[in-house]
């Protein structure tokens, strides 16, 4: 399939892996921001076929994972009330708060429904005028346009029984918070392709300049990730710090102007608390004053609910790139997708869920480290012998011709 097969091409990926190994001369720490990127890295073993000196750490780009526990408790409180229909995407139903999760509310008789679009919730409100319908509006900038459209449409149609519980968060302030945080080791970022498809990447340019970090916007296929890593390493080795767009087939510098205008019409920027991270200034969206009647926190008076987060789960440190899932003593033991202790194990985009899904809980930390330190037949460290795409191990030396002309031109002859 066009725009898919060539970005999963084994030969192209192998050539990129070898180009990275040839380019790197010193240790570098690169953070992939988005949870979708994390899953690609773990699923295809990309982190295991990189040179030992290139370390990938996982960032806060999982919207379910960073939704504050108190927001889950507010959702729990609203959904437990009689006469309401509480709507959410499915992955939010199992996220634990201090009072339990939304599935427990449903099992106790609450009307909690999974929807596939916020417009489904608007239609429910129109069909049930005698009931309050609430949509749990979480996510990064990617999901803000449809949520804004739902609010705008409900307001236009005069649906006074429709409201949204807003917990939108923004990527650029989180990157700044990571760079300013204690113990930060991140030297470059793989930027979030889906977010940038909506917002563009002008907001990332001041971050690259101020903190002197390369930022490469990437897609989500193996070749996307490896090409993004190669571009990042080239910048690091050359002492360059700029924003590059590897995901040019989907991302423009200016983003999607129509979506941005819709967001700006309905939302305004606010401070936001992130689970495991704390309050990050100007890192969220809230409804503008003219749409206040659709604010579920205001309508149900739950904005005073505050919650202390558990100290057992280390998901906050995972989200900041300070630890990895296998650093947690509970990972794969008392914390599994069936009985998660934290949001990073619940969400399909969470780093802990990715590690578990692709068998990392079956490996010891030493096995994971050793998988990156193998040498080739000539004894050269960093010259990787194989690349794994899916369940297939392909010798790098058999890379052959690249079917993706752009990649071939980028890495040169094998």
Give residue spans per PLM region.
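Short, surface-exposed amphipathic charged segments that create phosphate/polyanion-binding patches used
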Residues: 71-74, 126-133, 177-182, 204-206, ...
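A conserved active-site cap/scaffold subdomain adjacent to cofactor or substrate pockets
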Residues: 165, 183-252
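Hydrophobic alpha-helical scaffolding
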Residues: 6, 65, 136, 140, ...
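Phosphate/pyrophosphate-binding betaalpha-module
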Residues: 136, 140-203
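Short, basic, low-complexity termini and linkers enriched in Ser/Thr/Gly/Pro
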Residues: 363-393, 404, 409-414
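Internal helical hairpin/lid segments
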Residues: 226-317
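Flexible, glycine/charged-enriched surface loops at secondary-structure junctions
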Residues: 27-30, 161-162, 238-248, 274-275, ...
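Metallocofactor- and cofactor-centric catalytic cores in central/energy metabolism, strongly enriched
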Residues: 1-130, 144, 148, 154-157, ...
């Amino acid at each position: 399939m066009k725009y898919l097969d060539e970005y999963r091409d084994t030969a192209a990926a192998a050539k990129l892996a070898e180009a990275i190994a040839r380019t790197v001369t010193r240790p570098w720490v690169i953070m992939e921001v988005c949870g979708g990127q994390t899953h690609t890295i773990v699923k295809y073993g990309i982190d295991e076929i990189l040179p030992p000196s290139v370390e990938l750490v996982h960032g806060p780009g999982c919207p379910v994972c960073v939704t504050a526990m108190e927001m889950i408790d507010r959702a729990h409180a609203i959904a437990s009330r009689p006469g309401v229909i509480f709507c959410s995407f499915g992955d939010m139903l199992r996220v634990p708060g201090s009072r339990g999760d939304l599935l427990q509310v449903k099992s106790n008789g609450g009307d909690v429904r999974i929807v596939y679009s916020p417009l489904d919730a608007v239609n429910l409100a129109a069909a049930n005028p005698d009931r309050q319908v609430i949509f749990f509006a979480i996510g990064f900038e990617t999901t803000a346009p449809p949520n804004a459209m739902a609010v705008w449409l409900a307001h236009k149609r005069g649906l006074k029984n429709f409201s949204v519980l807003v917990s939108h968060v923004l990527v650029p302030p989180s990157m700044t918070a990571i760079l300013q945080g204690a113990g930060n080791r991140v030297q470059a970022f793989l930027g979030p392709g889906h977010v940038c498809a909506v917002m563009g990447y002008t907001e990332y340019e001041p971050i690259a300049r101020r903190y002197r970090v390369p930022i490469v916007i990437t897609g989500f296929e193996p070749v996307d990730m490896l090409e993004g890593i190669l571009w990042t390493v080239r910048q690091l080795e050359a002492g360059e710090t700029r924003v590059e767009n590897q995901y040019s087939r989907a991302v423009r510098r200016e983003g999607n102007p129509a979506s941005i205008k819709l967001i700006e019409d309905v939302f305004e920027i606010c401070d936001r608390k992130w689970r495991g991270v704390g309050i990050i200034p100007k890192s969220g969206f809230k409804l503008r004053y003219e749409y206040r009647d659709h604010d579920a926190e205001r309508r149900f008076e739950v904005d005073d609910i505050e919650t202390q987060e558990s100290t057992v789960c280390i998901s906050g440190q995972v989200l900041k790139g300070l630890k990895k899932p296998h650093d947690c003593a509970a990972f794969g033991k008392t914390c599994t997708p069936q009985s998660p202790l934290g949001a990073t194990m619940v969400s399909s985009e969470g780093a802990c869920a990715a590690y578990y899904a692709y068998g990392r809980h079956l490996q010891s930390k030493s096995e994971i480290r050793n998988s990156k330190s193998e040498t080739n037949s000539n004894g050269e460290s960093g010259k990787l012998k194989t690349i794994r795409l899916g369940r297939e191990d392909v010798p790098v030396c058999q890379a052959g011709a690249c079917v993706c002309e752009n990649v071939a031109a980028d890495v040169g002859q094998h």
